[in-house]
Regions:
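Sec/Tat signal peptide C-region and signal peptidase I cleavage site
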Residues: 17-21
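An exposure/low-complexity boundary signal
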Residues: 15-16, 214
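Bacterial N-terminal signal peptides
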Residues: 7-15
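Bacterial N-terminal signal peptides that target proteins for export
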Residues: 1-6
């Protein structure tokens, strides 16, 4: 029964996204064509994988007056490396900047009514921010990673963000990646009972032990819990830790994060105990998805949660807000 529900969940959650991506025209950017730099997703964050030159390089496609003009500047020989791409056509302009490998700014400005202004920001250590439109009709979405953003705001991402990200790296294939990652996530959720966070609590306490070998062993065991413990570790405030605990936890985070590009299997292992992903699914339009998410989150509290997946949108919104408050306090 759960497996049938999982399959239905997959279809409902991502069939529209896959259709949209399959039908989208491919217009490879100058940035992608020249391949002077490659990008990767590491735990849902965009970063530069490499820059193929230690020098500053520039390129232009199109001349003034042409329908499409593109510019590209790659700075690999500066203290702070950067990638700057610009694109202008009769409908508007796009500017993409990647600074120091992981600070991403994307802006789309419109000159035609069919184009909507878009702003995307990725800054280290803070949530991503996606803004759609201007004025009173604008929408703003916040999420810790791109995968969270795709779940919490699928329509906004499909229509406005993903076409811009394809200018960076057309090979990312978001629709296919999301579908496969969700399949893996459902499998992991069936077997998960949020046990990693329980194990992590006692190990974190040992990181402030007066015995050096105890601290070393606890740090090693934290790393052995795998990438799935990262969402919990990222919730822990430095103010609740000693300096020794802070230092060792940061070493664990860095090692677990690594520089490995995201795969469906890695995404599932990482997100299976991530509360924000499952809270987002409680607000989904489709009932089977809400039911599955509520069942999985109940494992977090070790009892059913105060949530009615068949309630009205307003009732569910209020229930999710209360659940979110409970999670923050625990």
């Amino acid at each position: 029964m759960r497996r049938r529900m999982a399959c239905l969940l997959l279809c409902l959650l991502f069939q529209h996204a896959s259709a949209v991506r399959a039908e989208a025209p491919r217009n490879t950017s100058l940035l992608a064509r020249l391949k002077w730099s490659q990008f990767r997703l590491v735990l849902g964050r965009i970063e530069v994988a490499n820059i193929h030159s230690s020098q500053t390089r520039t390129a232009t496609s199109g001349d003034e007056g042409d329908e499409l003009v593109e510019t590209l500047t790659i700075s690999g020989d500066t203290d702070v490396p950067s990638v700057r791409y610009g694109r202008h056509d009769p409908t508007g302009s796009v500017a993409i900047t990647v600074i120091n490998g992981n600070r991403v700014e994307i802006d789309q400005t419109e000159t035609a009514p069919e184009v909507v202004s878009v702003s995307f920001r990725q800054q280290p250590g803070t949530d991503m921010v996606l803004c759609i439109g201007d004025g009173t009709g604008s929408q703003t979405h916040h999420a810790p990673t791109l995968w969270h953003l795709l779940v919490t705001a699928p329509d906004a991402c499909e229509s406005h963000l993903l076409p811009l990200l394809e200018l960076l790296q057309p090979s990312w294939q978001f629709g296919e990646m999301l579908s496969r990652a969700t399949d893996e996530l459902i499998r992991e959720a069936d077997a998960s009972d949020f046990d990693k966070r329980h194990s992590a609590r006692s190990l974190i306490a040992k990181l402030k032990s007066s015995d050096f070998s105890t601290r070393q062993q606890a740090q090693q065991q934290l790393g052995e819990l795998g990438v799935g413990v990262l969402p919990y570790l990222n919730l822990i405030a430095d103010s609740d830790l000693t300096r020794e605990q802070q230092r060792r936890l940061e070493q664990v985070r860095v090692k677990l994060r690594g520089q490995v590009a995201d795969t469906p299997e890695r995404i599932a292992l990482w997100l299976v105990e991530d509360e924000r992903i499952w809270l987002s699914m409680l607000a989904h339009d489709e009932l089977p998805i809400r039911v599955f998410a509520a069942t999985h989150l109940a494992k977090r509290f070790e009892k059913p949660i105060d949530y009615d997946p068949e309630g009205t949108p307003l009732e569910r919104q209020e229930q999710v807000a209360r659940i979110r408050t409970r999670l923050v306090r625990r």
